[in-house]
Amino acid sequence: MIQTIQVQGTEKRLYQLIAPLVMNPDVLSANNNYPFKTTEQYVWFIAIDKKSVVGFMPVEHRRSGCVINNYYVSGDNRETLSLLNSSVLEAIGKEVRLFAVVMVNHQAVFEEHGFIMEKAWKRYVKMQKDE
């Protein structure tokens, strides 16, 4: 059974959990070779299955709201992506504006969680959680 945990953006545990993934060429390729980043303003939602990390969704806290960007799900698993989405929504609550920069092929999963499209690019869609 997959569980999700939250880890602050500069906690030592975060690096221990996700370093093998974010430094993996296949994972970087899935992120269009864009590096993953973190600061104290990030909270990472990490999906773990049998002691293995199977996905993560970093959420950056800004003045204007929170932003999901540069997430990863092993094997492009929609159930894991949906689970991470649910964990983020539960933790963030309805009072905070939530945005997401989503890969086009994941747009439907985010729509199932109440996100609406704001802007579309070639590979990504900017979405906002509908209030």
Could you say what each language-model-derived stretch is?
Residues 46, 51-60, 67:
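Conserved beta-strand in the GNAT
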Residues 60-76:
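Conserved acetyl-CoA binding element of GNAT-fold acetyltransferases
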Residues 91-104:
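Conserved GNAT acetyl-CoA-binding A-motif
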Residues 103-122:
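Conserved active-site alpha-helix within GNAT-family acetyltransferase domains
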Residues 1-30:
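Short amphipathic alpha-helix that is part of the acyltransferase structural core
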Residues 23-48:
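Active-site rim helix/loop that mediates acceptor-substrate recognition in acyltransferases
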Residues 76-93:
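Conserved acetyl-CoA-binding loop-helix of GNAT-fold acetyltransferases
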Residues 48-50, 126-130:
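Active-site beta-strand termini and strand-to-loop segments that position acidic
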